[in-house]
Amino acid sequence: VIGSVLGDSSQRAIQCRIAALLAGIPDTVPLHTVNRQCSSGLQAIASVAAAIKAGYYSIGLAGGVESMSTNPMAWEGGINPRVADCDAAQSCLIPMGRC
């Protein structure tokens, strides 16, 4: 579970999947994002902890991908150059519905 707030909804999912792929996490591992404005990373951690406590997960990974304190509200940054070295991460950049 990854907390993210700055990108639009589809961009959040894409950036989190790319981060997982670049970290070596297989694409068979489920991933989802949460958006809780300035506490998205903390919400991700709380969600995983609650799911483990409830028995839904035996293990989980959670975190956040931005710092609201250090990013302007209209951030238009570039894509991590390492994406070019990972075919699976590159495929996340294709807009939905296009081949």
Where are each of the predicted segments found?
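Acyl-thioester C-C bond-transforming condensing/cleaving domain
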Residues: 9-13, 20-21, 25-99
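Short glycine-rich phosphate-binding loop at a beta-alpha junction
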Residues: 1-3
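Short beta-strand-loop/turn "lid" adjacent to the catalytic site in phosphate-handling enzymes
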Residues: 6
